[in-house]
């Protein structure tokens, strides 16, 4: 009976997460995008929050972030970075690492999240941004989530005039690159 209750609770949590994410995706266009966002402190805050998850999985977190700013929705950019770093932890190998770098390239901020996980097959590198797509369906239960995280990441990046791509992936890990327009200096 305890196992059944636990299973029902797990499914309810998963359904709640699905509904929450679907609502979030449907409301993206209406979110105000006028916040002044300091990206390096935002990355620091996310890494601090995710440190217990990383430690639980024996994953080291590293960062090298320039002080860059942009205008947009602070909550949405937080969610974008959070999803990518959390995925880097969840889909990594024990003893692995997640590295976040932020640098200016021309008039954009380029955020790279690199992990040391098993990589993403070449034929899946575009599909992973589609809602409900999973590279390894057999691991979806143990990983949790509903398969909307990367779709949400792409929507948020595009909504802010940016993009997200799989820049590199091999059996030694994956690098996601997010480009976002920098704030104009007055």
Specify the residue positions occupied by each region the protein language model found.
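Short alpha-helical segment of the dimerization/phosphotransfer core of two-component systems
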Residues: 6-15
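Short beta-strand/loop element within the Bergerat-fold HATPase_c
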Residues: 95-107
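Short conserved segments within the C-terminal catalytic ATPase subdomain
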Residues: 53-62, 68
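Short helix-loop "hinge" at the ATP-lid/N-box region of the Bergerat-fold HATPase_c
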Residues: 88-89
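Acidic ATP/Mg2+-coordinating residue in the GHKL
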Residues: 115
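Short conserved segment of the HATPase_c
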Residues: 120-134
